[in-house]
Amino acid sequence: MPTLSFSPFRLLLSLGLLAAVLVAPADAQERSNEDARVSPNAAVSQTIGTTEVRITYGRPSVNDRTLFAEDGLVPYGEVWRTGANEATTISFSDDVTVQGEPLSAGTYSFYTIPGPDSWTLIFNGIANQWGTDYDESEDVLRVEATPESGPQVEMMMFYFENVDDTSGTGVLHWNETRVPFEI
């Protein structure tokens, strides 16, 4: 019976390939998303002047719930992930001002603290995180914005208005609440 002989290099290469073949399916299963999310992901981008602004977020639905209230789904005065699932992110390709305050180019997680007359918009330095993993010590900027009434929107959305070559207005809109912020 012939003996198989492997050089150390061929043996290591064979073991490495075997490990890659066995690990790849496990990794693929962990990352698959065969089931549709209840709150689907969305993204919107807008060029303002020469600056690219991109917001990526999960879109929760109203589903006949009370949203923004003392006893609502999103209680007044508490930090909210501003969407569903992973933390909402907002990216700026260049340095900008938000509500008149400077913010460096980069990607930030975006949280809010809703209130009946004023919302706090939070730009947090940890961009890739689960939405509930908020760490206040990583906040880069907090600004205030005034909520407005708007037409009913079932699924939360972001969009841009009043865009010209130097500025634009980002808008968070869910149910009958709009929160515009100047960029």
Where does each model-flagged region fall?
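Bacterial N-terminal signal peptides that target proteins for export
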Residues: 2-13
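Bacterial N-terminal signal peptides
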Residues: 12-21
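Short, functionally important structural connectors and interaction interfaces within domains
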Residues: 14-15, 40, 82, 88, ...
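Primarily secretory-pathway and cell-envelope proteins
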Residues: 29-74, 78, 127-183
